[in-house]
Amino acid sequence: MIRLFVASAVAAGLVALATPPRPAETVVVFTGDIRGYLSPCGCTKPQIGGVKRMASVVRTLREDSEALYVDLGNWTEAKGRQDQLKADALAELFARLKPNYLNVGAVEARFDPATLAALDQMAGGLLKSDALQAEFLQPTQHAPVLGLAPSPEAAILPMRKPEEVLAGRPDAIIVLFAGDRASAVRLAESAPGEGRVLIYSHRGDPPKEPMRVNGWTLVTPGDKCRFVGRIERVGGEWKNLRLIELGPEHRDDSQAHAIYESYLMRVGDENLLDQVPRLPSDVKYVGSEACRSCHMDAWDVWTHSAHAEAYATLESTMNHRDPECVGCHVVGLTTVSGFISKEKTPSLKDVGCESCHGPGSDHIIKPTVSMKAGPESCLTCHVPDHSPGFTFAEYWEKIRH
């Protein structure tokens, strides 16, 4: 009898082992909240993120399965001409990636109809919204994806409230909501969510585990194009969340690379660097060479440091005309007496003495004027996005003087 029981148990175990895992009914690859972060700056390595790696990973994930690809929106911060150029570049990239749903985020919802229509055209007519009331943005009826955004104060086109739209679409099992976590939780609480996933907007790294609210599964890709998400619907339940960090192990997508280079050329051609607002100052920048005669030891340390080659790193990546990059690779970009160009102000290119110690004109006239610098001098440029892992104690040892 015991032998029969053991044999039956073993047989049952073999049957269980032989049963293949249940296939996913739906696979979703998701991105969003790029916020203008098209590429890591490359100042230090390794860095994560960027649309070139994002495009490569998205293509790979879609090749591996019949995945739906969706983007949450919030392409840029919409703060000026450079963000407009970024939006153009992203529209061109999305036209190549062909997402199943390219959502209008809260940022894009502030655009005027003509700007939105132009972006939609550049994106191959893929821009969609179930909340924003514009005919050219209307998605296919009864599609499994619903695209929503909270209504910004400056919205020009009329918008429907997310809760109202969601209440009328119980068939939508994938909901994109370009609002923060607290707003996403309130939205999830407003409608039953069994078997449904809500992808929301989040500043910072995405939580590694889904949140469960009122039957809903809540996930996010985080911000600044640092992760690509993937999740499966198996047996009516959303599970197997993957958040792929866009590190240097992922190759650059060739089309995205070409689009990014074209964007940099437009930034240069429009001379955005010349349009950086500059503040007046009673003290003036004089260049590191002026410090040499009195501070020879410190000057020698500087000439052998990476700071003295900071501008060249931008030239090697074509970012030397990008105002978002140049400020931390030269002296005094936002001051009237600061860096203008390599040709006009060669003594102010690179991270020089005055980048940390401040303008030196008064000190030259009266050496007793204090020029001391401390850890706070570094933190303007050594921020987590550009200098991950920065600690003053460790980095100071490289330039101690």
Regions found by a protein language model. Give the residues of each.
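Positively charged n-region of N-terminal signal peptides that target proteins for export
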Residues: 1-4
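N-terminal catalytic scaffold of extracellular/periplasmic and nuclease hydrolases
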Residues: 20-228, 238-271, 304, 318, ...
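Short sequence/structural segments immediately N-terminal
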Residues: 25, 34-40, 237-401
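Bacterial N-terminal signal peptides
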Residues: 6-16
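Hydrophobic, well-ordered secondary-structure scaffolds
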Residues: 16, 21-22, 284
